[in-house]
From Swiss-Prot:
With IRS4, acts as a positive regulator of INP51 activity and phosphatidylinositol 4,5-bisphosphate turnover. Negatively regulates signaling through the cell integrity pathway, including the MAP kinase SLT2. Residues 176-185 have a biased composition (Polar residues). Interacts with INP51. Keywords: Lipid metabolism. This is Protein TAX4. Residues 186-203, 224-240 have a biased composition (Low complexity). Residues 469-559 form the EH domain. Residues 38-77, 133-249, 267-300, 338-380, 394-428 are annotated as: Disordered. Belongs to the IRS4 family. GO terms for biological process: lipid metabolic process. It comes from Saccharomyces cerevisiae (strain YJM789). InterPro entries: EF-hand-dom_pair, EH_dom. The keyword Lipid metabolism applies. Residues 276-290, 366-379, 396-421 have a biased composition (Basic residues).
Amino acid sequence: MHFPKKKHSGNLSVVELPKEALQDSLTAAQITFKRYAHPNGNAGSAERPRHLKVESAPVVKSEPSLPRMRQPEPRSINHQYSRETLPGHSEAFSVPTTPLQTIHYDVRNKASNSPSSIAAAEAAAYLAHTNSFSNRSSGVGSRDPVMDTETKPPRAPSALKNELQLNRMRIPPPSYDNNVRSRSISPQVSYSTSLSSSCSISSDGEETSYREKSTDEAFPPEPSMSSYSLASKASAKASLTDPSQRQQESDYTAMNKLNGGNIIYKGTLPDLIPRSQRKTSKPRFKHKLLRSPEQQQENLSRVYSDQTQNGRAIINTQQNVKLKTTMRRGKYAITDNDETFPYDRKSVSSDSDTDEDSNVMEIKDKKKKSRRSKIKKGLKTTAAVVGSSTSVLPFPHHHHHHHQLHNPNSHHLHTHHHTSSHKFNEDKPWKSHRDLGFITEQERKRYESMWVSNRYSYLRLLPWWPSLANEDDESHLQPLNLPQDGLMLNLVVKDIWYRSNLPRDLLVQIYNMVDTRKDGTLDRKSFIVGMWLVDQCLYGRKLTNELDQRVWNSVDGYVLGTINVKPATSDHYHNANNPLDKPSKLSVRQELKNIKRDLRNVRI
């Protein structure tokens, strides 16, 4: 399995480590050599393997009190390095952060691949590299660029298992400093292993290029918990940028990964348009209509990819984000030259112009509606009377169509009136109620269903009802004159009427108006009229002192052509010859209105 080479570019400089760090590194290497070369406590039994050709490699150890010379640059936000300690040991030793020089492993026998020999070889490499580093000159500018690589031949699975436990300790990336835009890249020694069927592993080492840099541009010493690094990266653009701008760029750089982390989106959130800079809808619509197709093409989002950062495509939209109600906008479509999106372009282009067309259609509909409403307000028609079912005119609908066909210049708009039955609203019962003054067939059926389900209940509680003790003595029994429809106990009526949440005194008044038996029970007609009065009070009508006979008659029959006429207090028609006693035109007109209203309400 081949791993791709990872390139790190940037201005780097080499800084010499202090003597304390070198001494600590030597101590850590000696402890590692003792623990892994002699796991059973035999200090002198292990020998240094001869088949390893080891060159010098520096050893670096982390210490909180010493200054940090360089920070590793994280490849992505979600890519974190976990730091773990070896099981059974309380002390943690850091992995060297500088790339080791070429190390050749020659697998000849099983004894050379033992854990003790591998650990001894690695510790010897640390010590040799530390000694070579201490003998080097301290001049920073005199060092040439170095290219370090690491290659590993195949190893046995038993040796790889122990080596993986040793190299699990990873150094987490330090916290990013917003005030300093310069970053440093720390090459890390990574042991990448993959066990295939043939137990072969091949990996390409990390290639890290270093450039000379003067000591004046180096970072100031800072305390760090991570390991010391031998390279530091300087950025000349950091000193020229504004701190607030750097803060915004660092906070709103959106790393939205798609396709397994190969695409990174940047530059969407910082481009939100404030409300103060937004224009009104009319100039925007006018601009949409008058602009040329070339300008429309320029407004498309410019999406391009950049493959320079760790081999990942960075998608920069460079488009001001407007929070619309839909995502299917034409200017957010994908360009033809873009190859970063593997999606189907037909689905995107098919809905690209739907919103612009819908805006035009909405404005046209508004114009039509406004003109239609003006025409309706200016006309005085009697369509309700002509099109009603109780109209005296023969074929009213045919007459209406005939008028529209033979008068093309007429401004009357023919509209179809569909009478839809609205659902009864318990919170607003007056909307589905008509004040007729009598009980309709629908209301009577609803009241009769409650009557049938609750009659003959608890009648034994009545004092005049024959008791169980007197049932044995047939001589003392008296025949009861009960109505054919049955009776209902007043306690049951009280329980039903209390559900209306009307005041108690009002319910008592209704019961006294409909109680005709005066024995603690109600018959069918009294119960239905009482229920109707309760509903009338719920509809908002006031309770009258006396009930009209028409209400009692509507319980057992159908009311046709009734007229709501107020009862006259005195007889005005006793003398027809007297012109003063004749009804006035106003009263006649009011009676005609009442007749028309009742004809519309009652269906013949």
